[in-house]
Amino acid sequence: MKIKLIFYFLILISLVACNEKKNEIDPDLLLSVALLQPPDRAENYDRDVQIITHTPQGFPVDCDLSYSDEDVNFFAERLKREIARYPRGYWIKAAAENIVLCRNLTILGNLQAGAVNPLLPFIFLSVPDGIASDANRQVFNGSTYVNFLDYYYNYDPRRVISHELTHSVDRRNSWHTLFDPEWEGLNHPGFQYGNHNYNPQDTSINILSISNSIPGFVSYYATTNHLEDRAEIGMVIMGPQTVNNQLVRLCQTDAIVAAKVRKTVSEWKAFWPFAGAENTEWKLRITQAERDCG
């Protein structure tokens, strides 16, 4: 969890270093830089997302490539389906142009389910062992048999994909990836991220499970920091259907969660204001979220 923040702190350090003479900023230079930016049009992002497999990565990413063909092919196909749920170009604008698939993905030696490169348009995702066979399994949920990934949704690739894409939209959308007082102001007065109010050694607690055990949050993991809080809200909106089905209940019972959902949807609509998204699942999900949490 803390490893992801290292990427962002590296950016912050570079910004501080570049602004040592902060009182000598040339406004004409800033205007010139702004004019160099291309217009924000959908056609600027009209290209395919690249799914990268069997390709080593450099420090600080350790990308194990020993996944089975069955697992990596299944994950890649599931990823293609996820990309197709969004308007064409959405992932490109989100700086998620390259998706690297690894087995046992590690960042600085720490295992990660996924990670975003804050400087380059890359997302790294870990392919779980046996994911292809798990997708065809049926398990008993207490009353009937259901698909393994529907019941154990934390193993569903759609969970980590939607979570990491939210991270990528956030860091592309604005600098609130570093500081976000407006978001933090939605929490209960006095709340501090990192004080989870639970024992991390208690293995009976699944920090990724969707629950409202801590008011204002959709999972224990969301209480880690504002970045993970935002990503978990995005995941509930766009993640597995089993998770999304809980959105109405969460919003009806928790005004803070409802406010976070509304803020996220508003930001996403501003991020992708272009025509042509009407028939995408992304549009359907955010429209439903507005109704459920309005």
Report residues per predicted region.
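Processing junctions and N-termini across compartments
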Residues: 12, 57, 286-287
